[in-house]
Amino acid sequence: MKKVRIGAVVAEFNYDITHMMLELAKEHARFLDAEITRVIAVPGVFDMPLAVKKLLLEDEIDAVITLGAVIEGATDHDQIVVQHASRKIADLALDYDKPVALGISGPGMTRLEAHQRVDYAKRAVEAAVKMYRRLKEDI
């Protein structure tokens, strides 16, 4: 079975959390006989769609994961960021016929909750690998 080549888009905002997510994602990818071959760091979750699109255009990338932590603030900004980014990210998967998995925690969570949810990175890798392999089975 071919090793799945994954591109990762990682938010720099809350980097203490997203860096842990990236390391966990790399480790889990190896466990699943996949590899994170390319990483693009972006300022925040809202900035992810353009980087996701760039990775989807690369022939050497089979699937993409997004890693971010959106922590609740004094306004509804966290809700808006996650809703808009996740919608556009899902649209890109459909537009480019490649799996894109969300490893974004939030909205509406505290910093402590974000630290407790770093395993969303593993879920994203798992979803990306499963989707890639299942879509290839039908060809």
From Swiss-Prot:
User: Which EC numbers does the record give?
Assistant: 2.5.1.78
**Which keywords does this Swiss-Prot/TrEMBL entry list?**
Riboflavin biosynthesis, Transferase
Superkingdom, taxonomy of origin: Archaea
| Binding residue positions for 5-amino-6-(D-ribitylamino)uracil | 13, 45-47, 69-71, 102
**In its UniProt record, which GO terms are filed under biological process?**
riboflavin biosynthetic process
**Which residues are listed for (2S)-2-hydroxy-3-oxobutyl phosphate binding in this entry?**
74-75, 117
- NCBIfam families under this entry? lumazine-synth (TIGR00114)
Q: What does this protein do?
A: Catalyzes the formation of 6,7-dimethyl-8-ribityllumazine by condensation of 5-amino-6-(D-ribitylamino)uracil with 3,4-dihydroxy-2-butanone 4-phosphate. This is the penultimate step in the biosynthesis of riboflavin.
Q: Which family does it belong to?
A: Belongs to the DMRL synthase family.
Name of the protein described by the UniProt record: 6,7-dimethyl-8-ribityllumazine synthase
- What is the species of this protein? Methanothermobacter thermautotrophicus (strain ATCC 29096 / DSM 1053 / JCM 10044 / NBRC 100330 / Delta H)
